[in-house]
Amino acid sequence: MDEGTFLFLLDTNRAKVLSFSDFNKRNFAPFFFFFFFFFFFFSSSSRIREFVCSATWTRTRALLCTKKHVFLYCFHNTSRENRIFKANKPDVMKDGFAVYMQRATQELFFTNKLNYLLVCVPLAIISNGGGWGDGITFTFSLIAICPLAERLGFVTEQLAGYTNSTVGGLLNASFGNATEMIVSMYALKAGLLRVVQLSLLGSILSNMLLVLGCAFLFGGMSRKEQYFNAEGVMMNFGLLLLAVMGLSLPALLHFTHTELHGTASELALSRFSSTILLLIYLAFLYFQLVTHTHLYEDEEDDDDDDDEEELVLGFWDSIVWLGVFTVFISILSDYLVATIEGASASWDFSVAFISVILLPIVGNAAEHASAVMFAMKNKMDISLGVAVGSSTQIALLVIPFCVIVGWFMDKPMDLNLQMFETATLFTTVITVAFVCQDGRSNWLKGLVLILAYILLSASFFFHKDPALIGRQAASSINEWNEEF
């Protein structure tokens, strides 16, 4: 609907139009919305065919249409393309509740062969309770998180199917990062601050190189070239470079030995920088979702797929399954954090390699699957929103949030990455920004990004983290003192 000035109540027998200005003067808005929601959900009258409300305040609009869908959004822009929730979505229960349950269950658990790995969920729980060893528990937990994260991505895609491409990409990035956020919170609680830093750094690296590279590679196999909105993507890279600045300054302060008050200066600078980065992220959300939505809309595409056929879950069912999968990921994340050092000793892999490479690959399974899926459907703006948008969200939201949470938990969580990690992050952002600057992708660009990630993986395999070595040495000394 255009600039909202009327309220419409459409019935098969009558139609009534009430001037919005008169309606607002009577101050009936709160009563109207209470009555509307009560009527909307509990009315069983078959005469009502359409009930549409469009109301305008300064920057809040409500659009409610059809008897089975409620759509609320807060954009000043009221164009159809910029509505958060799409109005023309099919009823997934049109064939009956039994058919819907059968189809939803099959899609959730039996259509993807990766779901066979869900058997590792009870094995991880049994291993943790039965004392099978840290290496075995860590292995089962790591494997079990992979299908859970992928199913989280599937359910997120179902939920995103009720939204436009901008919010859909944001939803995929947000719930894709749920695994990293949960693991980080448990590691922060356990005092494994370096694991938090390295795992989040690894998430950025894997999203920008591995996930985006796979999206370019598999998307380019069926098309010679694919196109995306370069202006919106380069805005993300500008924010990523700003985040790199915020992450590198505490490290530079430390390694140049110019701190005014030693480590206290690094910690104070990290907390201040984290606050600034969080404010930047909020400003970026307003920029992305309100003032410059056109930069993040999907490019028009002639061979666009029929989204209606892909939706097998209802809106609220998708939200419920998001919660279920998140709970199981939380349980397994607790096991991961508790056994990571024991697994490092069992596998003879460094904690740094496990944190930077193995954990993010599993945690980013949701982004990996959804980004590749959207790229193969030639929806490159959503694919870029998942991969690059997820990296931006980790750099501007998750990492600063962990610093602030650590502050309240009295944990000295800071942004002091080692020089090696800072250099890898900077070179990664520059490389990917150069690849994406022309707004075009092909399979060769994807292969370049994947090979770059393999190079980084090899470098972390041979890298010794001084901070982790010192922590492990201190832990060994404490254990020796307790024994003797």
Model-flagged regions — what are they?
Residues 2, 15, 44-484:
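Hydrophobic alpha-helical segments, chiefly the membrane-spanning helices
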Residues 11-13, 22-27:
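Intrinsic-disorder-associated, low-complexity terminal segments enriched in Asp/Asn/His/Tyr and depleted
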Residues 31-43:
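Long, low-complexity Q/N-rich tracts
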Residues 2-12:
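Extreme N-terminal basic, low-complexity initiation segments
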